Amino acid sequence: AATRAAQAALDAAHRAHQNVSVAVVDRDGRTLVTLRGDGAGPQSYESAVKKAYTAVSWNAPTSALVKRLDSAPTLKDIPGTLFLAGGAPVTAKGAPVAAVGVAGAPSGDQDETFAKAGVAALGR
């Protein structure tokens, strides 16, 4: 399932002509799968892992978590996290069970669209 989610996210980015890296983590934030698209920047791999870790830790898309920094700016100091759009949780009965992180597109919003495509692939 993790590989299917990662490939779906990478495929969505490819269709949009974006070179990204994708990571899928489990409930405990352990990396299950990483895929790096041709031409993805060297920073994108680590960023994708951190976005997925952040999304599963808070059970929320990382775009929503960015807004929390206004009231709790020290959240960004938690090791392993990255508060930029591009991470999307996978839930079962409302609880986080995994997350998909994507990095490398020109905007975090694009990254997150691709991450959500990965999550959606799990429902197929």
Model regions: which residues?
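Flexible, solvent-exposed loop/hinge segments and secondary-structure transition points
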Residues: A1-R124
